[in-house]
């Protein structure tokens, strides 16, 4: 299931509490770079709007299976998944602080 499909299901179920969306996550990305470090390893380095960086990796066991485009897609997805975790923590902290300040 893609992020877009998940978002559509969330909306169809009218789940409207504070949450992250794929658009929010994408809006945090300032720059995305790819580096091929060996015959089998692709690294995605994402710089966020605040300057923090996250990385994602993709590797295959055999150089015969290496595909640049596929490596970039997988490594970016892995890096973006880390942004979801970071932003999820930040949102939870903001909700916690708001609850404790009431």
Regions flagged by a language model, labelled:
Residues 1-102:
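Domain-level marker for long, solvent-exposed, non-transmembrane regions
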């Amino acid at each position: 299931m893609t992020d877009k499909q998940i978002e559509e299901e969330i909306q169809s179920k009218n789940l409207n509490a504070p949450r992250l969306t794929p658009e929010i996550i994408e809006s945090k990305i300032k720059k995305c770079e790819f580096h091929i470090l060996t015959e089998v390893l692709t690294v995605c380095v994402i710089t966020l709007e605040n300057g923090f960086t996250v990385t994602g990796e993709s590797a295959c066991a055999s150089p015969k299976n290496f595909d640049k485009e596929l490596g970039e897609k997988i490594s970016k997805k892995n890096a973006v998944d880390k942004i979801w975790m970071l932003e999820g923590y930040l949102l939870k902290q903001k909700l916690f602080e708001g609850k404790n300040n009431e």
